[in-house]
Amino acid sequence: MPEINTSHLDEQQVQLLAEMCILIDENDNKIGADTKKNCHLNENIDKGLLHRAFSVFLFNTENKLLLQQRSDAKITFPGCFTNSCCSHPLSNPGELEENDAIGVKRAAQRRLKAELGIPLEEVDPNEMHYLTRIYYKAQSDGIWGEHEIDYILFLKKNVTLNPDPNEIKSYCYVSKEELKELVKKAASGEVKLTPWFKIIVDTFLFKWWDNLNHLSQFVDHEKIHRM
């Protein structure tokens, strides 16, 4: 694996690069494990290294979506606006469990606490709606990137927020109209969106959002949407 100098990067974020992500094939079958660092190097992505991930879309009871702006300390896509929480299940028994994507949901509960400070007892993994999976690849810069199959998780409830500033620069709840304004700002270069969030906004999000209380019609655990 290539040697990359990380001395100029945020110390807390560099420590997270040692976490073991779940390696998969293009059909989301587990084939091994590797570090978060190796999974996010473009040099390895170009050779086909692919890992499992998730994106949480958390709505409050007013049907507003929680957005976060990634901190400037983040190694990939710093300062970009994105959905409520995006991360990876780890290669451990609890998060590898695949029945009803419970392992991915446990990982989401863990990261909602780590990033947004949401108490574990406020989010039961079984409350999350696993809709479908999205495959995508994107470069962050010349060194780092993403190559993931992303599990889409929806959750509607009011929660307590206490974000970690090392993870999150800002956050807000938005209506559909406010998100559309943010997308316009991104198109004009005023702000940046993460590539996975942009893909989901452009394809599925508003249709799902219109049917928050009737999401079962959109559940598709067979297909992987290749973007």
Curated annotation (Swiss-Prot):
State the active site: 86, 148
How, per the record, is the cofactor bound? Binds 1 Mg(2+) ion per subunit.
Give the catalytic activity: isopentenyl diphosphate = dimethylallyl diphosphate
Provide the Gene Ontology terms for cellular component: peroxisome
Q: Which UniProt keywords apply?
A: Acetylation, Cholesterol biosynthesis, Cholesterol metabolism, Isomerase, Isoprene biosynthesis, Lipid biosynthesis, Lipid metabolism, Magnesium, Metal-binding, Peroxisome, Steroid biosynthesis, Steroid metabolism, Sterol biosynthesis, Sterol metabolism
The Nudix hydrolase domain extends over: 49-199
Residue ranges of the motif Microbody targeting signal: 225-227
- Which Pfam families does the protein's record reference? NUDIX (PF00293)
One annotated GO biological process: cholesterol biosynthetic process
For this entry, the protein name equals Isopentenyl-diphosphate Delta-isomerase 1
**Natural source organism:** Mesocricetus auratus
The gene is IDI1
